[in-house]
Amino acid sequence: MSNKLVLVLNCGSSSLKFAVIDAQTGDDQISGLAECFGLEDSRIKWKINGEKHESSLGAFTAHREAVEFIVNKILAGQPELAAQIQAVGHRIVHGGEKFTRSVIIDEHVIKGIEECSSLAPLHNPAHLIGIRAAIASFPKLPQVAVFDTAFHQSMPERAFIYALPYKLYREHGIRRYGMHGTSHLFVSREAAKVLNKPLEETNVICAHLGNGASVTAVKGGKSVDTSMGLTPLEGLVMGTRCGDLDPSIIYHLVHQLGYTLEEVNNLMNKQSGLLGISELTNDCRGIEEGYADGHKGATLALEIFCYRLAKYIASYTVPLGRLDAVVFTGGIGENSDIIREKVLNMLQIFNFHVDSERNKAARFGKKGIITTDNSTVAMVIPTNEEWVIAEDSIKLITK
């Protein structure tokens, strides 16, 4: 067993994903999910060596109780494995401009994450709860913060500044930050290996497609543009998020249709996207089933999703100058051969030609090139954000 194990925590507002990761191989020794925090049926599910387990956490429990369960029940039952854990790595959604790389957590870092909470009000406060719970449960282990936004700090001003009065950026930090950076970092790095090219000479466009979705142009291993903005709302059509729209729609909804700003925010974040267009579901699998059955709303939602994605991919050839590959990842990107084929068919001007057999084979955790031999390359690479967090954690504590 490796002596480079890291407990990785990803705290959401009402859930906590966790895994014990081998930083050398990326393999998970333990993985699990605690969910339904604050409700009567809070539960925790986990897997050890392929064997599944489940337990109740008790009514109205939350992050601290979940971390305590991980320590006192799960890890206590695996003493040899627990003894090999070298650090606790935390996924943090928003680091603003304060954090351009992963850092060992101290009071200064905690304060910085708190100050960025206004940019990610649903996520950063939950991360802080998880950090404090982990410090209490693992007082002797170093704690490491890995930021989703850090990878995008290499973007030039022309990519991240909005065409608003510049003082809004200077005084209030209003700019494009981007998300999913840890995923884009991992898959762009893996794409260079598939292409057999040095990372610093590789130009790829990465599409992380899940209930949240974003596209990033990666030039020589660095993010040069990305679709999400100040918040995760900008960019692609997503499960329940609208992505790009005319900002005056907000004014129209408030002043002409009587919506409150809170209602508009809820509408754009939780009632739009695939769900809003289809009037059926936010789940892409349900959208594809509806499409196959001729459901009009599902068909329209699928077409808009693919069209928006194809437009973004096409536009990101501009900052790259030369395109080596398009990379699909995330739950939808890794599993939907239908969406991949539709998107690439819209991009035939860039010499993309789908190989149907390869495309259908690259699902359910399998990676590979999905285009023909004479085509511009498109590939599927399953993401592994936990591995990046584990790697960064070990690198920091062994400096």
From Swiss-Prot:
Catalysis performed (reactions): acetate + ATP = acetyl phosphate + ADP
Residues that hold Mg(2+) according to the record: 10, 385
Binding residue positions for ATP: 17, 208-212, 283-285, 331-335
Domain of life: Bacteria
Pathway of action: Metabolic intermediate biosynthesis; acetyl-CoA biosynthesis; acetyl-CoA from acetate: step 1/2
Active site: 148
Gene Ontology cellular component annotations, sorted alphabetically: cytosol
GO molecular function: acetate kinase activity; ATP binding; magnesium ion binding
Cofactor detail note: Mg(2+). Can also accept Mn(2+).
Keywords, in A-Z order: ATP-binding, Cytoplasm, Kinase, Magnesium, Metal-binding, Nucleotide-binding, Transferase
Residues marked Transition state stabilizer (site): 180, 241
EC number of this enzyme: 2.7.2.1
Cofactor section: Mg(2+); Mn(2+)
PROSITE patterns to which the protein is assigned, alphabetical: ACETATE_KINASE_1, ACETATE_KINASE_2
Classification via InterPro entries: Ac/propionate_kinase (IPR004372), Aliphatic_acid_kin_short-chain (IPR000890), Aliphatic_acid_kinase_CS (IPR023865), ATPase_NBD (IPR043129)
UniProt cross-references to Gene3D superfamilies, sorted A to Z: 3.30.420.40
Protein's GO biological process: acetate metabolic process; acetyl-CoA biosynthetic process
Homology family: Belongs to the acetokinase family.
Function: Catalyzes the formation of acetyl phosphate from acetate and ATP. Can also catalyze the reverse reaction.
Subunit structure: Homodimer.
Name under which the protein is recorded: Acetate kinase
